[in-house]
Structures are given as C-alpha cells and as structure tokens.
Amino acid sequence: MDLKNKKYIKGANPYMPLWEHVPDGEPRVFTYNGETRVYVYGSHDTLRTEYCGLDQVVWSAPVSDLTDWRYDGVCFHSMDGEPLYAPDVVQKGDTFYMYAAPDRGSKVVVAKSKNPAGPFEDPVETELGFDPGILVDDDGRVYAYWGFTSAYCAELNDDMATIKPGTLREHIIPHCERGGGWWEAEEEHADKVFSFFEASSLRKIGGKYIYIYSRRQCEAVPEEGLPADSNGYLAYAYSDEPLGGWVYGGIISNNAGELIECADGTKKRAYPTGNNHGSIIEVNGQWYVFYHRMTGTDEFARQAMLDLIDVAVDGSGRVYIGRIEYNEAGEPVSSAETEMTSQGAHIGGLDSRALISAGYACCLTSETEGTTPFAESSAGAYIKPVYEGAESSPIVRIKSGTTAGFRYIDLGTESPKEIYMKLDDAVSGGRVSVRLDSADGECIAAVTTEQGKSGYTAALECEVTGKHALYFRFEHDDKTVDICGFDFFTFE
C-alpha cells in the first residue's frame, strides 16, 4: 500500500495533537476581534513525574469546526516554581479573568487579560479554594464554586477576588464517603449519591444552574464494571438558584470507556480509568462534554477529550444530560452516561483512508484483567505518551488477549479492499484480527506477525461500508511475550 500521500487524522479524540497533554479542560465560547471560537483552559501535564506543570496553555477552534484546533500559546506561568493546578476563565465586560491555582492548588489567584488567549497578568490572590469554577450570571453577578471532598460556593465582590459578606455556603452538595489513605473526608455531609470529590464547574442552561463535578465512588460497583475508589465520573446537579437547592442529576460521562460483559458473566470497563475534570458546552446547537483520559502508566500524561451529549429539561424542571431517551411525545424520560469515542467531533467517524494513530483507541483491555485505576497497577497494554511534535502515540506492552478498539471509523460508501497496520518490534507468531462492531465481532482481516517486520497489509475478507466500531485483537501462544507495538493503521 502506498502511504506517502496519506496524512494523519487531526482533531479526533483526543482532540488536541497526541503530543499535547492538557487535562482539566474548561471549554468556553468567546468572541474576540469579530471571531467566535471555543477556547479550552486546563492544566498542563509536562512534568511527567507528577500532576500538571509550570505553565498553562490555550488551544482554540472555530465554532464551525471542532476538529481544527490551534495552539494559542502560553497564557500563564507559575509564580513560585511550583505546579499550576486546574484553572477557569470567564469574561465580564471586555475583560477576561483567569482563576489560576498555583502551588499545586493550595491557593487561587485571579489574573486579567483583554485577549481570551492571554497572557493573563497582574495576579491577585483570592479567597477561593481548590479547583475553582466561576459563573457570571445573566445579571452580571459573579459566583464561585470550589472544593476538594467538600464543596463550597459564594458570590464575589466586584473585584472578582473577594467573597461578598454573608454569601459563603459550605457542604453545598454531599461528598464522597471516606478517604483513600492520602486524604480524609468528614462523615456528617457524606453520601453515596452526590459523592462529590473535586473539579467544580458551573453552567446556566435555560434558567437552571448546572453544577458539574468529579464524583468518586469509594466502593466497587460490579454492575458498572468499576473498582473501588473510581473517580473517572463527571456528574451533575441542578438548581433554580446559584447558591443552594441542588438536586442530583446523574452521570454525564466516565473516562473508563464502554461497559463489557465478560464470558464468566462479570463486567469490566474498556479503558484504564483515573481522575476526571471537565465541563459541557453548546456549539452551533450541539452539546459536548469536555473531559480527560489517562495515557501511560500513571495519571501524569492526561489528554483532552470531547464527546457528544444531549441536554434537556422536562415539564417538571428535571434536567437530563448525557445520552437521553425520549418518549413518543418527544419528552425526556431518562439519561445515561455518554459513550467514550475515538471520533470526538468527527461525527461521521474517522476517515478510514487517512493514517489513524493507535493512540486514538478508546478501548484497551485484556482477557484476564478488569478495569484498573490506571495501567501501572496491571501488566496490560497502554498508550505510550509522546511529546514534542510526534504525530502518533503507539500502544505498547501488548500481550495475548489485548484488544484495542476504535469508535468510530468511516469506511465510506465503497468498501476498501485492504488494511495496512504498522506493528513495531514484533515477534514471530502473533495473530492480529480486525473485528467489526465488537471485540467478538465478524473478522474482516487478519495478519500474522514476523520477527523484525513492521508493515503488514491484509486483504479484507468481506465488503464493509459505512460507520463502524473496529477492534484489533492480539493473540499469541505464549501468553507472557510482548507481541508488538501498535503504531497506526489505514485502509485503501
């Protein structure tokens, strides 16, 4: 297969380049110099041995195309040589305010700019705490939300930094039940429903205040395929007022991926889970959830993700966010977490004739291991973090029983005839089968690996058109050997 005229897919999921690591993303729509764009503000996982980094960067995309992301540069630098944790940015009047969290989030400062891409300057220390989320209401009043294991909120004074007297509220929603060894949670305001952990983010939709946050499930949930101490959930609550009256809504998304039923009847998730932080945004009538996922063998190389969601309010005022079911009258009746995909804003699926990096896999499992907090606690495969301009991030440590899945691929109106896979550092005797729609689906192509060979072409065994999930299943008679690294694939 001739690859020289093929280009790598851009703006898939993760939607930033695969070498970029911006977790905790807060998406905002701002108009500047006559152009309306989506701006994302997050942490910056550049230290590689701990969370976050010493600068924060801005990426933006035109509202007409959320696959076309532009690097707008560094917007804020560490003030003290310590990592900057999750920020937020809002606009009031002609000024943009960044709420940055220096010294690993131990304090919050507010800095200003006339440009949504920054730089944000003249930082002033605020009275806020960990993981600030800011809401500028329709009447111009400003509210702040923050907290780690306990949730707080308050109205801000006109200085955008200090709390208006008498407005501070504590324990505004119940938090998760217990500590995990390195943190403690008091018991009086805990429950298993709201289960607030961190990552406050506020939106106002149709007169409703929406509180988005990271939810921690301290006990294992076998029916959801999740281990104890899972905090990959983004959950939401809603209210008719900004400082109280919150009603639990449900789960918007989970960075552990799809739910899989195993042969023995147990369930597991399709992707190594870890912490989560994000929010929702409407762009040209379509709602999206922004969040992050893990790569590597720890939580220090996270990547920015987005997926489609619906948002609706029924006649009683109940808010639904995620994958919504409607009755025959078109009224919302239930919602569930949205799926985690490889396509992101490529709504029709990733172009099968382009080069598709294995780093876009949204499913990465083995036969024997269930969902793990992240890959260091297993012997399983993982997406290798890349930095400094690499166009592809490979899957490595692939052993027999590994499955890598991609939701979704556009195979076109005319079936391709063959598939090419780049499989580095291969050993002899590995078997790779390409399966349609599920890990146990119809096999449409297969190759056998050879020592020292990296490029493999296989004819398709049947005609396939349209949009499908694809799963690559790796097998070998020796269950202990690393079969290969998986770099990219393409069809022709």
Pin down the residues of each PLM region:
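Carbohydrate-active catalytic/glycan-binding domains of CAZyme proteins
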Residues: 1-492
